Amino acid sequence: MDAARQNPVDHDPAEGSRVEDGVVEHPNADDFGHARVLPEDRTWFKRAVFYEVLVRAFYDASADGSGDLRGLIEKLDYLKWLGVDCLWLPPFYDSPLRDGGYDIRDFYKVLPEFGTVDDFVALLDAAHRRGIRVITDLVMNHTSDSHEWFQESRRNPDGPYGDYYVWSDTSQKYADARIIFVDTEESNWTFDPVRKQFYWHRFFSHQPDLNYDNPAVQEAMIDVLRFWLDLGIDGFRLDAVPYLFERENTNCENLPETHAFLKHCRKVIDDEYPGRVLLAEANQWPADVVEYFGDPDTGGDECHMAFHFPLMPRIFMAVRRESRFPISEILAQTPPIPEMAQWGIFLRNHDELTLEMVTDEERDYMYAEYAKDPRMKANVGIRRRLAPLLENDRNQIELFTAMLLSLPGSPVLYYGDEIGMGDIIWLGDRDGVRTPMQWTPDRNAGFSKANPGQLYLPPNQDPIYGYQSVNVEAQRDSSSSLLNWTRTMLAVRRRHAAFAIGTFRELGGSNPSVLAYVRELDRDGEHDIALCVNNLSRFPQPIELNLQHWNGYTPVEMTGYVEFPPIGQLPYLLTLPGHGFYWFSLKASEEKP
């Protein structure tokens, strides 16, 4: 790692930005050391398995009750052992923490309880040494109201930051824009007593939206990108990107101006940092989200990846209804994406299980099935972890994970789901799904040596999901544990490139309770065919599949290498146990050992 260069001014760059004569001065990347960079690979994200980890929740190396960057470094060997290719870190920037770090006070400073910029560079370097990439959230739409840009904007409307935010003398503009946080916000406008104007916010009132109609704001955010990319980060999940611009008589989402700015960001990446990645967080319908990949004729010139939000709730819906059609229909509605693009798919993350992209009837059904206790609801979603959502049913957990790893897109795991961690529904907001990682049955779940009262949140002590019974140490030693099963499935997926970059063909079949599809890769010397069959019913189910296209091929089960009867002209009959699944590799006669 390069030695850190000395800052010529009498100011420690680790202290972040500062205000001098009404101007906010930011540190430079050359003030810090830089991490080693992995070999350039412009398509690594298409084959990667992502793992979302909250820095605060993973491991506390400083024994102050909160996880930190040094603690994450200590656990990189576990993540390498598990089979993770890329870490996704939610915001670790300096913040008043009124919204879990998504209210950023300084883009150029690490939250002190997490560490320093040098600690982050050390994390990047240690991860890259193990072949693990790291991306983080960049909240582009808004800042905290304690950010110096906002403080200068409200104090001095005629100063350099006076137009950094969206101000108005009235709260009636952009009336067609929906309110996102309906539980807490009555309006997208809030009156500021200092400037005596209203400011615009799509999220909480303490998160004013930046004014992207101001070119200075666009360049300021590009500078933030460059700062962290220079240090060695592998990419960004761009948070809340549909809302960057506002226009009257629109819903202020997915506007052409937003796409133009993202093209500018992508050009910076391609020209200056090839191999780095932009991942769009756009909770929209597939036809709208696909626009965030950019021009298909160029292979994509906006974001490299985008989350497929509507797919996730329909996986839950399909299994509870014991019908493949919720999944089949949303995949059929998903347009093709550019060649250099990839979906990101997930089951759970640090937010609620969002139900924005379902109909009112479907939302009521999901609440009735998965959130019987009113405390389980949050905003327009359900604040529960995967294992409790599935009633801790190992067969369901395995089925859901198998679909996550085999449907089109790069899978994103959420920390703790690999061991079946539970939630604490009596904690406020979404904290119930953000509790400490459960490493051992020892005090504080092995997460921290601090006194229990110092912990940022209590570890789960539930009789079923508590750390005394659900922890990494116990499961790592058990060959039949969920942890070792997950590790095995990640290894199987890595051996079969069709899961990552193969085509997708749904097979239909005689039984609507069974979802069957083929992932096939045949290019650049790689030939791989994966047949996936998923029983969405709790009861055993038969299925007849038309596999004539692969006549003469032999299905070989991927985990045990068991050969099934060769495929012929007749429908291929399989019987699956309740919530069971098969992963087959289809082998031509000349490929069989």
Please name every model-derived segment.
Residues 1-593:
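Active-site and adjacent substrate-binding regions of carbohydrate-active enzymes
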